[in-house]
C-alpha cells in the first residue's frame, strides 16, 4: 500500500529503473492516480517533491495536508466529481483551499454530476497540462517538512546527519475504508520532526532547519 514504506519505495524504485533503462527527461516526470491511487499521489509527491514536474490526483484526498507546503515547486491538477459518494468533494475543495492560501500553482476541475468513476474524457486535458510543466530542479527557495530518516537529497541539498524520529503513518486506514479516508483521517499521525527552509536572496543563502545535524549544499553559478 502507498502508506507503507515498501509501497512508496516500489514507486520510487520503479521511476529510478525506468530512468536508468530508457531515455527519460528527469525534468518531465509526472504522477497521477485515481481514488486510493490519488491518495498515494498526494502522499508520495509531498514526501518527494524534488522528483516530480507536476501531479494530478483524481478523486482522492490529501491525507498529509499539513505538509502540503512541500509542493512549492510542484503544480497540482485536482480533478473531482461533485457527486462522488466515496471520496466526498469536500476533500478536493479542502486541498484547493490550502493551495490557494499558500499561493501555489494549481488547476482545479470539479466535474458536475460525476460520481466516483475515472473521468476518461479528461485524459487528454491532463496529458496536455502535464506537457506544459517542467520540473524546477534548482529552485532559489526550498521548503520541506517530514521524513529525512535516511541520507537523501532535497533538490540541491543533501542531508547527511539528522535526529532520528519516526515519520511513517502510525496506523493504516481500516480495510473497510481504504477508498474513503474522510472519516478516518484521525488515524494518520505524521511526524514533522525534520524541517528545512532555505532562501537565496541578494547573494546570501539563508538556512533554517529543525532536527538536522549536518547537510551539504551543492551550489551552482546561477544560484548566487
Predicted features along the sequence, with ranges:
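Gly/Ser-rich "nucleophile elbow"/oxyanion-hole loop immediately N-terminal to the catalytic nucleophile
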Residues: 2-35, 46-51
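A conserved short beta-strand
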Residues: 50-61
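Short beta-strand/loop motif that positions the catalytic acidic residue
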Residues: 72, 77-80, 84
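Acidic catalytic loop of the alpha/beta-hydrolase fold
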Residues: 83-88, 116
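Catalytic nucleophile loop
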Residues: 37-41
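Alpha/beta-hydrolase-fold serine-hydrolase catalytic core, especially in secreted/extracellular enzymes
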Residues: 101-107, 112-224
Amino acid at each position: 500500500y502507498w502508506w507503507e514504506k515498501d509501497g512508496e519505495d516500489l514507486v520510487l524504485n520503479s521511476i529510478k529503473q525506468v530512468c536508468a533503462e530508457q531515455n527519460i527527461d528527469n525534468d518531465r516526470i509526472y504522477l497521477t492516480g485515481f481514488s486510493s491511487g490519488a491518495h498515494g499521489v498526494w502522499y508520495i509527491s509531498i514526501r518527494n517533491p524534488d522528483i516530480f514536474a507536476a501531479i494530478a490526483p483524481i478523486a482522492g484526498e490529501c491525507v498529509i495536508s499539513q505538509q502540503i507546503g512541500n509542493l512549492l515547486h510542484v503544480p497540482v491538477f485536482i480533478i473531482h466529481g461533485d457527486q462522488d459518494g466515496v471520496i466526498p468533494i469536500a476533500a478536493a475543495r479542502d486541498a484547493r483551499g490550502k493551495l490557494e492560501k499558500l499561493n501555489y500553482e494549481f488547476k482545479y476541475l470539479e466535474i458536475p454530476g460525476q460520481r466516483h468513476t475515472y473521468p476518461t474524457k479528461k485524459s487528454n486535458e491532463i496529458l496536455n497540462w502535464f506537457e506544459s510543466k517542467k520540473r524546477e530542479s534548482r529552485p532559489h527557495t526550498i521548503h520541506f517538512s517530514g521524513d529525512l530518516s535516511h541520507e537523501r537529497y532535497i533538490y540541491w541539498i543533501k542531508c547527511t546527519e539528522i535526529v532520528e524520529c519516526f515519520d511513517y503513518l502510525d496506523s493504516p486506514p481500516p480495510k473497510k475504508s481504504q477508498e474513503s479516508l474522510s472519516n478516518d483521517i484521525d488515524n494518520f499521525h505524521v511526524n514533522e520532526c525534520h524541517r528545512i527552509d532555505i532562501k537565496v536572496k541578494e547573494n546570501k543563502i539563508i538556512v533554517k532547519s529543525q532536527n538536522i545535524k549536518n547537510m551539504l549544499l551543492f551550489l551552482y553559478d546561477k544560484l548566487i
